[in-house]
């Protein structure tokens, strides 16, 4: 049973968010939570909160055991860009893009050992 959670329009660029997200992809839930607690990047607490939310959804809505969950898929999509202006010399203006991200995580149960694949 797949469980999905999503956070939208996070004020961090997708490129920087993917650096953190790539670290936890495919890991068991406990390991992913432990890794995110020690990472210094701005995205780490956001991803940590998202993983905890997905685990709570799995436990509360689907009666899944959190100890048997792993990060099946996690990805970052680009959100809307905020356009800002920065003054330059001679009265000119430069455009700055404030990038945002959408982060999606899909958790699934670990397959049992000896269970047939299908």
Curated annotation (Swiss-Prot):
InterPro entries: Ribosomal_uL22, Ribosomal_uL22_bac/chlpt-type, Ribosomal_uL22_bac/org-type, Ribosomal_uL22_CS, Ribosomal_uL22_sf. The keyword RNA-binding applies. The keyword Transcription regulation does not apply. This is Large ribosomal subunit protein uL22. Part of the 50S ribosomal subunit. One of its GO terms (cellular component) is cytosolic large ribosomal subunit. Disulfide bonds: none annotated. One of its GO terms (molecular function) is rRNA binding. Pfam families: Ribosomal_L22. It comes from Thermomicrobium roseum (strain ATCC 27502 / DSM 5159 / P-2). PANTHER family: CHLOROPLAST 50S RIBOSOMAL PROTEIN L22-RELATED (PTHR13501), LARGE RIBOSOMAL SUBUNIT PROTEIN UL22M (PTHR13501:SF8). This protein binds specifically to 23S rRNA; its binding is stimulated by other ribosomal proteins, e.g. L4, L17, and L20. It is important during the early stages of 50S assembly. It makes multiple contacts with different domains of the 23S rRNA in the assembled 50S subunit and ribosome. The globular domain of the protein is located near the polypeptide exit tunnel on the outside of the subunit, while an extended beta-hairpin is found that lines the wall of the exit tunnel in the center of the 70S ribosome. One of its GO terms (biological process) is translation. Keywords: Ribonucleoprotein, Ribosomal protein, RNA-binding, rRNA-binding. Belongs to the universal ribosomal protein uL22 family. NCBIfam families: rplV_bact.
């Amino acid at each position: 049973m797949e469980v999905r959670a999503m956070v939208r329009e996070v004020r961090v660029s997708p490129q920087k968010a993917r650096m953190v997200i790539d670290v936890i992809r495919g890991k068991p839930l406990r390991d992913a939570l432990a890794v995110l607690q020690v990472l210094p990047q701005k995205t780490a607490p956001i991803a940590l909160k998202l993983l905890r939310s997905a685990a709570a959804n799995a436990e509360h809505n689907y009666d899944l055991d959190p100890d048997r969950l792993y990060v099946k898929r996690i990805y970052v999509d680009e959100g809307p860009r905020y356009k800002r202006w920065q003054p330059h010399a001679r009265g000119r203006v430069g455009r700055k893009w404030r990038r945002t991200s959408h982060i999606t995580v899909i958790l699934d149960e670990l397959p049992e050992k000896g269970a047939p694949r299908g």
